[in-house]
Amino acid sequence: MRHSKSGRKLNRTASHRKAMFANMAISLIEHEQIVTTLPKAKEIRPIVEKLVTLGKRGGLHARRQAIAALRDAGKVAKLFDTLAPRYASRNGGYLRIMKAGFRTGDNAPMAVIEFVDRDVDAKGAVDRARAESAANEKEASSL
């Protein structure tokens, strides 16, 4: 019987789920909005909300716990320095899930998960910077 079993398996092994959720959390912290399937969005929300709470707590131990979960010190720095102060006055509910229709191909329910009061410029900022630097290098090499 399945009584009192929490969480979804998502047709993956435990190690695959753990790695996938860590990667999704990193992407969500970096871009502040991602598009994924609805079950994955529902599973990632409590993970990232606990990480934001760790960021609000501050301190060395909380930072080390976040690094252990995310495996990316740069994103942990953003979590503690940018996101935690932004949500200092909010007690939970840092993320929102919006349904986004169905995926073409397999008709899977899709969702957009994003931070409440997110920075709109954060989405795609890394890609824009990468494209801009590539264009600058191309100009410099052509001169």
Swiss-Prot record:
Any one of the GO BP annotations: translation
Residues passing through the membrane, by range: none
PANTHER family for this protein: LARGE RIBOSOMAL SUBUNIT PROTEIN BL17M (PTHR14413:SF16), RIBOSOMAL PROTEIN L17 (PTHR14413)
Assembly mode: Part of the 50S ribosomal subunit. Contacts protein L32.
Cellular component aspect of the GO annotation: cytosolic large ribosomal subunit
Assigned keywords, A-Z: Ribonucleoprotein, Ribosomal protein
SUPFAM superfamilies xrefs: Prokaryotic ribosomal protein L17
Annotated family: Belongs to the bacterial ribosomal protein bL17 family.
Domain of life: Bacteria
Pfam families linked to this entry: Ribosomal_L17
Gene Ontology molecular-function annotations: structural constituent of ribosome
Name of the protein described by the UniProt record: Large ribosomal subunit protein bL17
Keyword Ribonucleoprotein among UniProt keywords: yes
